A protein has these predicted regions:
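Flexible, gly/pro- and Lys/Arg-enriched active-site loops
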Residues: 310-348
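Short gly/pro/ser/thr-enriched loop/turn and capping motifs at secondary-structure boundaries
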Residues: 103-106, 129-130, 198, 237-239, ...
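Active-site ligand-binding patch in enzyme domains
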Residues: 140, 150-157, 161-294, 303-306
Length: 367
């Protein structure tokens, strides 16, 4: 039970990095000697010291003969920082307990093997499912090459997202919108469509002042990182004057053809081929994976939402339901053309249902 206690502490530490570590995984480390925590730390930002290094610095000489609990296999390769395996070996750690192996091909068991070769007692698999939940995006990208996609939808009780006139602000509550801010902050990128940009002119930024107090305490304003904003714009309809381009951070456009407009340096273009007359979403996701995008939060209209669902690209559905009815003339939740049989319907299963102010948030994953 002691091992579980210390690993749970390491997992809790790892969660603190979930806003800032992209494209790296979230990792926590706790060093224990004679039943006392002598060092702990978590990975805070890509390019900065890993969790093990922070914990070893805190432990100092007490690390010798101690047990290190780490939520992911210690790295064994030279990247932007030196290998954590070398640091653990040099510190004289006697035992390493890892929650899981690292699927990164540059590590993939080599770290644990190196520790064993140095005479360290090594085990892995403790609280592995919890560790995997912590790094869903990183793990999916490493295993498949694709980012982890969360599709956010907001609707009325009768599944409507806007009035017939297009009016949609606001169907859901201020509490739900604060929850969306937290979800944005945890995501590596936010995806939308040119139709949404033209209709709503959104900023699609993380607004620190709108985060809940608990998130603000974990995520100081000076550390604020804006997710990459990605716009699917196959007809080059978005202009440099739109708000999404004017915000801090990067904006990427997925296009099927070059655009001749003058864009700020923070704008990038990804040229993606067409498939059946539309931008190929599968190729786009492959390209984003190659760009080291771990997780994508989608905020878009019914057309893009439906296209992602029909392409089988959605890993999670996050649906905010407001306790109001908009009527049959209002706009529907998503467009799924050609769907005629129940057997062909995209299937999900409920993972969590929670109250968010007066609304309900449905959290679903692929069946």
């Amino acid at each position: 039970m002691q091992d579980e206690y210390y690993m749970a502490r390491a997992l809790k530490l790892a969660q603190r990095g979930r806003f800032t570590t992209h494209p790296n995984p979230n990792v926590g480390c706790v060093i224990v000697k004679d039943g006392e925590i002598v060092g702990e730390g978590y990975h805070q930002r890509a390019g900065e010291p890993h969790a093990e290094v922070h914990a070893l610095r805190m432990a100092g000489e007490k690390a010798k003969g101690a047990t290190a609990y780490v939520t992911l296999e210690p790295c064994s390769h030279h990247g932007r920082t030196p290998p954590c395996c070398d640091a653990l070996i040099a510190a004289g750690v006697a035992r390493v307990v890892a929650a899981m192996q690292d699927p990164n091909p540059q590590v993939a068991g080599r770290g644990l093997y190196r520790l064993q070769q140095a005479g360290i007692d090594v085990s892995h698999g403790l609280m592995m499912s919890e560790a995997e939940q912590l790094n869903k995006g990183f793990l999916k990208r490493m295993r498949t090459g694709f980012p982890y996609i969360q599709l956010k939808l907001g609707a009325s009780l009768d599944g409507r997202t806007a009035m017939a006139s297009g009016e949609s602000q606001w169907i859901t509550s201020p509490q739900a919108r604060r929850d969306v801010q937290r979800q944005r902050a945890q995501s590596h990128a936010i995806l939308t469509s040119s139709a949404t940009v033209l209709a709503d002119d959104p900023a699609l930024t993380v607004r620190w002042s709108e985060l809940d107090e608990q998130t603000q305490a974990l995520y100081p304003q000076q550390n604020l990182r804006q997710p990459i904003r990605i716009v699917i714009d196959s007809q080059n309809r978005v202009m440099p004057e739109h708000r999404i381009v004017q915000q801090p951070g990067e904006t990427w456009f997925a296009r099927t053809q070059e655009d001749s407009s003058e864009w700020p340096e923070t704008v990038r273009t990804l040229l993606i081929p067409e498939h059946k007359g539309h931008l190929d979403l599968v190729v786009l996701m492959m390209q984003l994976g190659k760009q080291q995008i771990n997780s994508i939060w989608v905020e878009a209209g019914p057309t893009l939402a439906g296209a992602l669902l029909q392409a089988g690209l959605v890993d999670e559905l996050i649906v905010y339901i407001a306790p109001k009815l908009l009527g049959s003339d209002a706009h529907g939740l998503c467009t799924l053309p050609g769907l005629e049989k129940l057997a062909d319907a995209p299937q999900f299963k409920f993972k969590e249902i929670r109250h968010v102010g007066p609304d309900v948030c449905l959290h679903l994953v692929g069946a």
